[in-house]
Amino acid sequence: MLWAFNRPAKALPTMVHLGYTNCAVCHISPQGGGLLNAYGRSIDLAQSFRGGDYQPSTNKFVKWLSWDDRITQDVRNVTQGQLSTATDEPTIGTVRARFMYRNATELGKGWRLSAVVNGENRSVKRPNLSYEPPIQPEEVYLTSALVSYRPKSTLEFSAGRDPLPSGVNNPDLTTYIRARNKYGYYDAPVQLKMFWWGKHYQINPYAFGPSGTEPTGAKESGGGSLAEFYLLGKHTTTVLGVNTLHGEASTLHRTMVGPYLRLGLRSWGILAEHDITNRSLTASPTSFLQHASYAQLFWYPREWLLISAIGEQLQTQRPFQEHLIAGRFEVTSRFSNHITLGVTSRFQENMISSQFAPSVALQLALKTVQ
């Protein structure tokens, strides 16, 4: 069984819990999942066990490194120890460590350069499927390199290499909705995308092409669009959206439609997504459907403590028939804006072979704060 560590923090439940409808409130990039802006850094500290008011550093050397606050950057480390097993297989212990450097440089007049560089001791590829092979990663890997232009506060254009926009935008890229739809750790195609958002909506069309790291036959080009709408209510945050995508490679064509929901009710909330993907092989008339489902119920008993129960299901039609279900229970504690500790218990069951695969993991995430 393959299961890997998440990104360092559970930013998405925090966003929903606090009543924010989109990522642009706290993140430099409107796609989210990246560096925090000044307001986001204040929320990051306030929602931790340490608490307090965020104050940017006044150290002269730090100011020099940040080019007088034009550069936002951080260094992150996520280390995970995991014990996993499966039916008729031994227990395996693994330790994975990932280092990440992220940089966003404001050039003025709305222009921005950004990049993310990763290093790791053990790669975590998508499942090696005959019809959709994974990218073979290197020890040091560039997952994002973008030029962005924001002509107004609610409109941004970006070009370069980056993960594709996704619905729920779950930070765990090993979930079925991510790993089985080419949203893995190393899937970072070249793309041109637009973000346009307002109080009640966000529209995100995009076009993409191969980055050059894909296996032969899997160099995919295509386009898609993400659209979501916000239904605001008293003490309630409801976001309904859909992500559509069509991609073509020399060996495979695919079309995906994925409706999703983000619901927040004060201290608890729900994240849900169901992706339907139709794939057709170019060398034969074969086409087959895939259904991938994700649902997360989360609760904040304290601002710094997140408890989640997660359920997943994957069904793929013949000739590549699969039926997997998975469940997970997570407890994540944000001790400060530098330190996050998480404990996870997970199982996966193959409904065709009856193989049962449980695992437990302890994860420590560390980061610098500018």
Describe the residue ranges of each PLM region.
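Transmembrane beta-strand segments of Gram-negative outer membrane beta-barrel proteins
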Residues: G52-T87, T91-G93, K109-A115, F157, ...
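Surface-exposed coil loops of outer-membrane beta-barrel proteins
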Residues: T79-Q82, V124-S144, K152-Y230, V239-N243, ...
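The canonical Cys-X-X-Cys-His
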Residues: Y20-P30
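Outer-membrane beta-barrel "beta-signal"
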Residues: N22, S333, S354-Q370
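Detector for outer-membrane/organellar transmembrane beta-barrel domains
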Residues: E220-Q317
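Transmembrane beta-barrel strands of outer-membrane/channel proteins
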Residues: I71-L83, A115-G119, A159-R161, I203-G209, ...
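Repeated loop/turn-to-beta-strand initiation elements of outer-membrane beta-barrel proteins
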Residues: L107-S114, S153-F157, P163-S166, K199-P205, ...
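Residues that define the transmembrane beta-barrel architecture of outer-membrane proteins
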Residues: W67, D88-A97, E138-T143, Y186-V190, ...
